[in-house]
Amino acid sequence: MFTVLNQVSGKSFKCGDEESVLDGALSNGFNFPYGCQNGFCGQCKAVILNGEIDYDGEVPSVLSADDIDSNMALLCQCKAKSDLYIAVDELDSLAAIEVRSMPCRVEQINHLNHDVIQLILKIPGAQSLQYLAGQYLDLEHSDFDSRYYSIANAPTNSNLIELHIRLVDDGKLTNFIFNSLAPKSILRIEGPKGSFFLREESECPIIFIAGGTGFGPVKAIIEHLINIGSQRKVYLYWGVRSEVDLYSNLPSEWSEKYTNISFIPVLSEANETWDGNKGYVHDSVIKDFEDLTGFEVYACGPPVMVNAAAKSCLEHQLVKENFFSDSFEYANVSNDDA
C-alpha cells in the first residue's frame, strides 16, 4: 500500500498498487472529480508533484503533450508505484452524496424514437437515492455486465429515476432492454457517480452542448435550474444526425415558456428541407459565440464530440475551469456486452 497526499486539501489516503489512484481515492471517501472512468473524458486529471505512477499500456490519448510536460496524470487509469504527492481540487458538492446499491422496479418503457428508450425505474419506498442533476449510475442485471447511464430527471422527492438508453447494435444489454425487458421487472442500480453536475454558486450564462442521448443529463440539469427558479441564461445546442434523432420536444417547449432558455438543434446529416443549423454542434456554438469569456460550458455526448468541443471552446477564451463534461464511452464493456 502506498500513501497518496493531496497538496490542496492536506489530506491523504492509502492506495494499493493494483488499483487506480482514483479508485483508491473514492474508496476512502475522497470527492475527486471524475467522469467516464475509462480514460476518455479527462475529468480526473491531476498534477503529480512527486512520486511514480504507471499505466497498463500506453499513456491515455486524452493527455496532451502539454499535459505530460506539466506532470498531469489521469487518475482513473494510473496506478501508484510509490508514495504520491498530488494536486487536485476536491468537490465539496459531492461530500453529502453517498454511492448506494439498491434494487429497483421497471415502471415504464417508452420508445422515444427508433433507437432511444426512456426507461423509468422505481426505487423501493423504504430507500432513497440522493444525487446531483447530471450524475450517472450503473445499471445492473444478473445476466449481463453493468453499464453506465446518466440520470435524465432532476432530483425531486419522487422515487422515480429516468434513463435515456440508445440501442447499441451488438449490445447484449441494450438489446435485452429494447426487446425483452418488461414492466415490473427487477434491476439493480449503483450510484450516483460522476462529477458532471451544475455549479449552482455561479451566475455565469450556460452553454449546454449535447450529442445524441447526451441530452439526458443536460435535461436533468435544465429541469433543476427551472425547479430552483434560476434566471441564468441558458443556451442548449443539441447535435444529432437527422431530425428524427431529436427524440424530445422538451427543448422547444422550454424555449417557448422561459425567456432565459434558448434551443439550437444542429443536424450533421440534414436533408434539403432542414433550415436550421447544420454540421458539427460545437462549430455552431463558436459561430454564435466567438468570445466565451464569462461563460460556463457543459458538454455531454460521444468522446470525439466532447473533446472537439473542449478544444474549440478553450481556443475562444473559455476559462478551462468553466468547461465541464461527461463522455458517453462504451468501452467500459465490450460491444458484445453493452
PLM regions: where:
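N-terminal pre-ligand scaffold of iron-sulfur
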Residues: M1-F32
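Iron-sulfur (Fe-S) cluster-binding segments and ferredoxin-like electron-carrier domains
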Residues: S20, G24-P33, Q43-D92
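Short, charged beta-turn/beta-strand-edge "cap" motif at the junction between a beta-strand
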Residues: D92, D143-D145, G191-F196
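Ferredoxin-reductase
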Residues: E98-I186, C204, V240-S242, V266-A270
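FNR/FR-type flavoprotein reductase catalytic core
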Residues: R166-A338
